[in-house]
Amino acid sequence: MRREKRLNQGIIKNIAIVVQPHQEISNGPDKKYGGVERVVTFLIEGLLNRNVDVSLYTAKKCSIDCRLIYPMGLFDGEFLEKFNQTQLATYSRKIREDLENKNFDVINNHYDPITFVALQNIRTPTITTLHGPATEENVNTFGGFSECYFSAISQAQKNSYPSNMNFVGDGFVYNSIDDNHPFSDNKRNYLLSVSRLEPIKGQKNAIKIATMCGLDLIIAGNCLDKEYFHEEIRPHLTRDLSKPEKQSERSEFINDISKYQPDVRTIIYVGEVNGHERDQLMKHAKAFLFPIEVEESFGLVLIEAGIAGTPVIAFNRGAIPEIIEQGKTGFFGNTIDDLIGFTKRTSEINSADCREHIKKHFNNEIMVDRYLNLYRTIVAANYA
């Protein structure tokens, strides 16, 4: 079938996905990477399962079965973390040069403002997925291009951006998760916090909630703000398993978490976790705490908790009410006192309800369907 006829029939077969150069798009339980990387991985795998050819533009080694295109060559992670604005602009320009010589049906750019600007007026229909909040920088960049196509990752995030932006369809596609993730109703007597360690993520709040409830707390995540850690987190720790000399003890602790039964109240920091470790901690937690200090665009970790059968306790910010079913899969409130009270009510939550809610509303098949609908919409507009 000729390409133009195929596209007129809404048949999408050839997609380019663009990510930031430092992002590792890979599958496997041992990977340590953030929410955007996991979502893009799920999207690519879902598209490949629908017999859609996918080309990924990146600069970091990735282990995924799609076509990998390195416009500036392959760089190691340490170099990419120091990528400056000039190098990023060069990366974006080289992506555009390569894209202009290819016949993709659709280009899906995942978030980066510099790459977004570099892709303006390219002949292939292009949509940008916004993974981040409506900061001043993002609003100034994305809000100035009312003719471009966008998708948010929640209704709340969409509403936070300027109304003149051209959001396609409903304007958002929820992130998703593989519903084969591990589940357990064997909950142990600890609360869990998994996130980057920085003030906006609210580990300080989580410590207060756990302390006031008389419950143990396990904190996991990469430490981005050393001052915050030393001033607000470290003084409360009874064990720090993140240190290099503690790795054997740390592995044993996480692997045996299903038997967790401490003699005294503890607050434990385990450092950054990979997928397998996160699943282990998540599925046995009494509740997952998410008392963040910003308007949440989505929060992939919330659906990771739900699929594991673990209720979420969170501030009512951003997309939280779109993800948590109040009183059924967790609780959200406006103050620390609200969250302390809700944490004491976690026994009211059925683990199976948490999992079923996520499988019904946030599974990979739904996300891939909705992205394909977005692609068809912008292709149809382009060929009208």
PLM regions: where:
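N-terminal strand-loop element at the rim of the active site
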Residues: 2, 22-27, 45-82, 225
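Donor nucleotide-sugar binding/catalytic pocket of nucleotide-sugar-dependent glycosyltransferases
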Residues: 125-136, 143-182
